[in-house]
Amino acid sequence: MSSIKRALISLSDKTGAVEFAQTLHKLGVEILSTGGTAKLLADAGVPVIEVADYTGFPEMLDGRVKTLHPKIHGGILGRRDLDEHVAKMEEHGIGNIDLVCVNLYLFAATIAKPNCTLEDAIENIDIGGPTMVRSAAKNWKHVAIVTDTADFPAIAAELEANNGALSDKTRFNLSRKAFSHTAQYDGMISNYLTSLSDDVLSGTPEIAGFPGRFNQSWIKVQDMRYGENPHQRAAFYRDIDPAAGSLAAYKQLQGKELSYNNIADADAAWEAVKSFDVPACVIVKHANPCGVAIASNTLDAYKLAYATDTTSAFGGIIAFNREVDGATVKQITDNQFMEVLMAPKFTAEALEIAAAKKNVRVLEVPLEAGANRFELKRVGGGLLVQTPDIHRISRADLKVVSKRQPTEQEWNDLLFVWNVAKYVKSNAIVFGKGGQTYGIGAGQMSRVDSTRIAARKAQDAGLDLNGACAASDAFFPFRDGVDVIAEQGIKAIIHPAGSMRDQEVFDAADEHGIAMVVTGIRHFRH
C-alpha cells in the first residue's frame, strides 16, 4: 500500500470536511481545493493550494471550468505501474493525485424549489465533479475516491492506522460507491429533463408527469435467507432518500433478522396505522389487516383490534402509532404469538417485557407524514408506476344518497371503516362500530363474497353487527351486497358509487332503512 501524498477536496456537502482535512494535513498530505471548500479549509487553518494556482490556469466561464485540466485528470488517471504513464506525466509536469474527495452539485435540492427555472436546473448540473469522480473510480488501484462525507471518519482512521495508506479493498469499495453515486446523479437529471412538460423551453417549466426514461436507485440493506418462499432468493433495498415516516427508516431493537414476508407485512401495517390521527393498533396477516381499532391508549386499541379476529392475529404483525407501554406489551405476549411489533417508540418497561420473547422482532419507525413519490409494480418485461393513494376524506366530502341520514356515531364509524378499507386487498368489505373493526372481507373476486366473509368473521368473533357500519372499497355492482349487509343488522354504508346500477343500490338501502353515503373516490388495492 502506497501512502497518500496529495489529495483534491471539492465538496458541495462539506460535512466533516475540516476535521478530515486536518487529519490529512497531520499525515503530511498536500491538499488541493476549489472555491468554497478551499475557503472553508483555509479559514480553519488547514493549508490548501487553489486548483487554479496548481494548474496555472484560472477558473473561468462562471465556474463551469475549474478542474477540467490535464494536470488534474492526468494526475488522477495516470497508472503508477506503467512506465509509459509515469514518463509522460514527468514530461508534462503532472504530479500524482492519490485521493479525491468530491460530491456533486445539489441538483435534487435545486429542482425541488417551487420556482426552479430550466436555467437554474441546468446550471446546477455538475460537469467537473462527475468527471473527477469517474476518473478516480476507474483508477482505484492507485487513487481513492470519497463521495460520501459519512465515510470520512472511517477513512481517516484507516489512514492513521496505516501511515497514510488505504487497502486495495477499501479503494475498490469506494470506487463501487462512486460509480453508483454518479449513476444515481445522472439518472436524477434524466428523470427531471424527460418529465418536463411541452413548455420545457419556457422560464419555469412544469413537471408533466412521469419521466420518459425512468431511472431509480436503491441501496441494499440486507440479503435475506430467502424470498416469499424458501426456494426464492431475496434482498431488501431502501431508497437513496426514503420518504419521511417510511418503513425503510426502521430501527430494529431486538429479535431475529427480518424476513421478506416480515418486511412486506410490516409495510402494510405501518402504512395503515400511521393514517390515523388518534391512538391506533393495526394487526396484519399476509399484507391484509385482520384487526384494526382506535382508542384513547395503545392497550385498549390492541384489545379491540385483537378481538376482531383472534385466530388470524396469531403470527401477525402488530403496529401502533403511539409510544407503547409495558402493559400493552404484556397483554400482547399473554394473548398471542407475533412476528413483528412496531411503533414510533417503546417505554423501557415495554422493551424489558418484549425481551422475554427474544425471537420477536421489535421495530421503532419514525412517525412522520410522507409518502413515496411513486409506487412501482413489476410485470413481465415492464414496470407499472403510479402516484401513491394518499387521498383522505372528511365528512364534508361525503354525499348522503339515502332517505335516512347517518347519526353522529354512524358518521364517525363510517369514516373509520372507510379508512380501514383503503388498506385491505380488493374486493374489500369492512364492518365496524365504535372505532373497532367487527369483520373484514378481503381479496375476493366477488364483492358479495367479501361481504359474506366479513359477516362470518364477526359472527366467529362474537361481535354483534346490529348498528354497525360497513365500507366497500369500490362500488356495489349489484344490490346483493347491500342485501347481505342488511341481513346483519348494519345500518350505515359508505362506498364510492359509480356503478351503472347505482340507483338500484341506493333503493336497496332505502328499502332496508340504511343510511348510505358515497365518496366519489375508489380505493382498489391489488
Swiss-Prot record:
Transmembrane segments: none annotated. It catalyses: (6R)-10-formyltetrahydrofolate + 5-amino-1-(5-phospho-beta-D-ribosyl)imidazole-4-carboxamide = 5-formamido-1-(5-phospho-D-ribosyl)imidazole-4-carboxamide + (6S)-5,6,7,8-tetrahydrofolate; IMP + H2O = 5-formamido-1-(5-phospho-D-ribosyl)imidazole-4-carboxamide. The keyword Hydrolase applies. It comes from the Bacteria. Pathway: Purine metabolism; IMP biosynthesis via de novo pathway; 5-formamido-1-(5-phospho-D-ribosyl)imidazole-4-carboxamide from 5-amino-1-(5-phospho-D-ribosyl)imidazole-4-carboxamide (10-formyl THF route): step 1/1; Purine metabolism; IMP biosynthesis via de novo pathway; IMP from 5-formamido-1-(5-phospho-D-ribosyl)imidazole-4-carboxamide: step 1/1. GO terms for cellular component: cytosol. Residues 1-147 form the MGS-like domain. GO terms for molecular function: IMP cyclohydrolase activity; phosphoribosylaminoimidazolecarboxamide formyltransferase activity. One of its GO terms (biological process) is 'de novo' IMP biosynthetic process. Keywords: Hydrolase, Multifunctional enzyme, Purine biosynthesis, Transferase. Its EC number is 2.1.2.3, 3.5.4.10. The IMP cyclohydrolase activity resides in the N-terminal region. PANTHER family: BIFUNCTIONAL PURINE BIOSYNTHESIS PROTEIN ATIC, BIFUNCTIONAL PURINE BIOSYNTHESIS PROTEIN PURH. Belongs to the PurH family. This is Bifunctional purine biosynthesis protein PurH. It comes from Neisseria meningitidis serogroup B (strain ATCC BAA-335 / MC58).
